[in-house]
């Protein structure tokens, strides 16, 4: 049974709950459900970048926008410095959020095989699928978050077989009673199974 967290029950100076992860791990859907459960605004960093003119160019080869990170930081700061409201912030650039404003950072992880299927269904190009699968195997989003915030603020959740509502409910519980951070290591698992080379390019 889900427990509702009232935004008035927290005396906090940190205003942001972050949801990050490789494309395809479920960030946007989980953030929307969590925002609804907590009755707080959800900020998509991708949309924020577009709205503030922070997409400086387009990388045609990688089929993605190039983000002006300084511009995006300037757009983020006024949002998180408003201590009167709590936010859920999701996206691929959560490490740009000032650490002092972060309550918790949740990194969504997905088994590389499941991630490949999801990105294929989305119509991603083969090169972009491989790039994102490699990033997931290597734990790039995990490492970026740990580098940006204190390790005890960073939690990982396996979304391979878990629906967005269930992930949001788990995050809600972890906000109330934070467990010891769990680290998901696809590299170790794949290496143990003798499959790591199948997922990484030279």
Regions found by a protein language model. Give the residues of each.
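Pre-Walker A (Motif I) flank of P-loop NTPase domains
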Residues: 14-16
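Hydrophobic anchor at the beta1->P-loop junction of P-loop NTPases
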Residues: 19
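P-loop (Walker A) phosphate-binding loop of NTP-binding proteins
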Residues: 22
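Conserved lysine of the Walker
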Residues: 27
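Hydrophobic positions on the alpha1 helix immediately C-terminal to the Walker A/P-loop
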Residues: 30
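ATP-dependent small-molecule kinase phosphotransfer cores
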Residues: 41-97, 190-195
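A glycine- and Lys/Arg-enriched "phosphate-lid" helix/loop adjacent to the NTP-binding pocket
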Residues: 57, 109-153
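NTP-dependent small-molecule kinase module
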Residues: 146-202
């Amino acid at each position: 049974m889900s427990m509702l967290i009232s935004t008035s029950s927290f005396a906090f100076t940190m205003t942001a709950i972050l949801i990050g992860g490789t494309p395809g791990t479920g960030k946007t859907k989980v953030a929307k459900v969590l925002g609804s459960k907590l009755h707080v605004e959800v900020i998509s960093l991708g949309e924020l970048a577009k709205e503030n003119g922070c997409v400086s160019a387009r990388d045609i080869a990688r089929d993605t926008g190039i983000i002006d990170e300084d511009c995006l930081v300037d757009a983020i700061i006024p949002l998180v410095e408003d201590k009167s409201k709590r936010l859920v912030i999701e996206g691929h650039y959560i490490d740009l959020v000032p650490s002092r404003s972060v309550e918790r950072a949740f990194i969504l992880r997905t088994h590389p095989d499941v991630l490949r299927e999801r990105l294929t269904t989305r119509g991603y190009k083969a090169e972009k699928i491989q790039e994102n699968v490699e990033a997931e195997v290597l734990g790039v989003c995990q490492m970026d978050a740990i580098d940006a915030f204190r390790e005890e603020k960073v939690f990982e959740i396996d979304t391979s077989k878990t629906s967005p509502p269930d992930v949001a409910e788990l995050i809600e519980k972890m906000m109330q009673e934070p467990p010891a951070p769990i680290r998901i290591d696809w590299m170790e698992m794949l290496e143990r199974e003798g499959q790591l080379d199948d997922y990484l390019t030279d």
